Regions:
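One-carbon transfer enzymes
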Residues: 2-167
Length: 167
């Protein structure tokens, strides 16, 4: 059962869910929202399982209306904008975006960089706020693409780095 922790506001300081857990007594209620038919659908269960093994209560949802109040809401390849009511019900609302924010705001940043011939793709973990791609930045990383990488290899690397930032 997810509880309402709206009074417990803390700041993530560059360690994803692990740092938030330390701040919030070790056990978190975590919701992961992803698009039901999106590219992460085939692998997101592995992130859920890893977080559960660490003692967290984890719920995977595909629709904004199914998001309960949580300590941490991860919005991972979630194709819908989230209302302020939903954002305000969670302690943290975290997004992983494949650009060097604030540069590269908008949809499908990895795709545009691949089209532009980039092989080193920046990736950013940040706090979701009402304005798109505008929240506080907590972590940055890079996805390194090989010359012959096809979409399956690119998505695998993207998923691995996304999950690393969330753990």
């Amino acid at each position: 059962e997810f509880a309402d922790y709206s009074a417990r506001r803390h700041v993530v300081d560059c360690k994803g869910a692990a740092r938030v857990a330390a701040l919030l007594d070790g056990k978190l209620t975590i919701t992961i929202a992803t698009s039901e038919h999106g590219w992460l659908r085939g692998s997101v269960d592995s992130l859920c399982e890893k977080l559960r093994k660490e003692g967290h209560l984890v719920l995977l949802v595909y629709k904004a209306e199914d998001i309960p109040p949580s300590d941490v809401l991860f919005l991972l390849s979630f194709w819908n904008l989230i209302s302020s009511d939903i954002l305000n019900q969670n302690i943290h609302n975290l997004v992983v975006h494949e650009s060097d924010l604030p540069k590269g705001k908008g949809w499908s940043p990895l795709t545009w960089q691949v089209i532009d011939g980039e092989s080193e793709i920046p990736i950013t973990l940040f706090e979701a706020v009402e304005k798109v791609d505008a929240g506080a930045i907590y972590m940055r990383g890079k996805i390194l693409l090989g010359e012959g990488d096809l979409i399956d290899e690119i998505r695998q690397k993207q998923a691995e780095k996304t999950y690393d930032l969330c753990e």
